[in-house]
Amino acid sequence: MENEESGKSFVVQWNNSEGGLSEGPLSVLWSLIESYKVDIFDVSLSRITRDFLSFLRISETLSLELSAEYALMAANLIYLKSKALLPDPGFEEEDYEPPLPPELVEKLLEHKKFQLTAKKLSEMDQTQTGVFRRESNVTLDEEDNWLDVSLLDLISAFHEILESQSVEAEIPTLLTAPHRFTVEEKMEKILFTLREKKEISFPELFEREKPEKAEIVATFLALLELSKQRILRAKQHKLFGEIRLFLVEGHWNGTEQQSKD
């Protein structure tokens, strides 16, 4: 009974795209860890599994989709716990409490980092809520006369991509997905594409069937890094129109030589 009551304080909620409230299993796990007031590497796998299952028992408002996510996480925790508690002939300590496995710790730390990044982007976006934009009918006639794109425009376009229905749900691979996407690899891919096509639209960076959120974030960070290094420029031919990406003049030969080495 004590566990069920204490479990009510472990609910973590945020606004979803439909305006309602959502809860995620990784956020609940992180909230549990914070309530223990110990280092994440010292958290008992048995304890967090027990408390997570207790949380599920008292949760009555989960949607069908979220229930499936929680059920999968619960199954993963139970599997990891049973695996960790298998008898080890070389280890005889009776009170041994297995810690969280490295793969779960890694996912939790990634999740927290992503949450902090999303919060920062949201705060930056909210600073623009008092600014009313008018759709501009002014198109720049000269082909080479483009408007520079601001960071806030890029962030807005990034949010649209993240909220797209084509983004793949990552729940089935919460604990098993390896690091398949790095910023460095995405930088190379963007440069290769621009060398071939000369210019591309912002959405073209993410044109893969059901891209994962991790891939989208890595691609966006690669875009920002290339822009920071003045290798790439983001422009639009119409105020608040489609964002297009170009290589800065002077980097064509350098990038081509690097690709040949």
Swiss-Prot record:
<comment type="similarity">
    <text>Belongs to the ScpA family.</text>
</comment>
<dbReference type="InterPro" id="IPR023093">
    <property type="entry name" value="ScpA-like_C"/>
</dbReference>
<keyword id="KW-0963">Cytoplasm</keyword>
<dbReference type="GO" id="GO:0005737">
    <property type="term" value="C:cytoplasm"/>
</dbReference>
<dbReference type="GO" id="GO:0051301">
    <property type="term" value="P:cell division"/>
</dbReference>
<keyword id="KW-0132">Cell division</keyword>
<keyword id="KW-0131">Cell cycle</keyword>
<dbReference type="Pfam" id="PF02616">
    <property type="entry name" value="SMC_ScpA"/>
</dbReference>
<protein>
    <recommendedName>
        <fullName>Segregation and condensation protein A</fullName>
    </recommendedName>
</protein>
<dbReference type="InterPro" id="IPR003768">
    <property type="entry name" value="ScpA"/>
</dbReference>
<comment type="function">
    <text>Participates in chromosomal partition during cell division. May act via the formation of a condensin-like complex containing Smc and ScpB that pull DNA away from mid-cell into both cell halves.</text>
</comment>
<dbReference type="GO" id="GO:0006260">
    <property type="term" value="P:DNA replication"/>
</dbReference>
<comment type="subunit">
    <text>Component of a cohesin-like complex composed of ScpA, ScpB and the Smc homodimer, in which ScpA and ScpB bind to the head domain of Smc. The presence of the three proteins is required for the association of the complex with DNA.</text>
</comment>
<dbReference type="GO" id="GO:0007059">
    <property type="term" value="P:chromosome segregation"/>
</dbReference>
<keyword id="KW-0159">Chromosome partition</keyword>
